[in-house]
């Protein structure tokens, strides 16, 4: 999926730089806002992915237990959120309608994958995971 995103993003961005066409969205946004969005998205994505891998790998146990510390105390799917934020950074760079559509498709894909995984986690962890679901948002901290 990530390869598909970069292929579409690259082709879309290439059209802007080579042929000079643009979208209304690109013309409406200022460079500082785009730069800030890119920077924040990239930093958050690297942080979330690194911290979530560390939290999970340090707490591997048999039988399985719920990891609800570190970034898993903020959102239920920090690895997926990190990947989505990484793609969002490239969306800020290209700011095209095609990139926005691809990012939305990515979000839907990751949301469905997370929902499927949560069904399996409920089977494995039971009430412990359903209580975790009630405490935390799937994607956004505090929501």
Locations of regions flagged by a protein language model:
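Membrane-anchoring alpha-helices and their flanking helix-loop junctions
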Residues: 1-68, 85-143
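Membrane-interface loop-to-helix entry segments
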Residues: 73-84
